[in-house]
Curated annotation (Swiss-Prot):
The lineage of its organism: Eukaryota, Metazoa, Chordata, Craniata, Vertebrata. This is Dermaseptin-H4. The modification Leucine amide is found at residue 70. Has antibacterial activity against the Gram-negative bacteria E.coli ATCC 11775 (MIC=0.8 uM), and the Gram-positive bacteria S.aureus ATCC 12600 (MIC=0.4 uM) and M.luteus ATCC 49732 (MIC=0.8 uM). Does not inhibit the growth of the fungus C.albicans. Probably acts by disturbing membrane functions with its amphipathic structure. Residues 30-40 have a biased composition (Acidic residues). Belongs to the frog skin active peptide (FSAP) family. Dermaseptin subfamily. Keywords: Amidation, Amphibian defense peptide, Antibiotic, Antimicrobial, Cleavage on pair of basic residues, Secreted, Signal.
Length: 73
């Protein structure tokens, strides 16, 4: 009977260790995925601000050109 108790305890202990390792790996994978998402969103923000600045400069240049054309008339 004592042998069965020890065997059962060993099986349960090894199962808990295995589960703990799996959960730790899952957490690490989730952290890596979140970090990749953060890096991608930073890149998108940088790209969006560049596009916005180019659009502003183009609008200003177009406005100056239009005012210059009106001033020549």
């Amino acid at each position: 009977m004592a042998f069965m108790k020890k065997s059962l305890f060993l099986v349960l202990f090894l199962g808990m260790v295995s589960l703990s390792i799996c959960e730790e790996e899952k957490r690490e994978n989730e952290d890596e995925a979140k970090q990749e998402d953060d890096e991608q969103s930073e890149m998108k923000r940088g790209l969006w601000s560049t596009i916005k600045n180019v659009g502003k400069e183009a609008a200003i240049a177009a406005g100056k050109a239009a005012l210059g054309a009106l001033g020549e008339q």
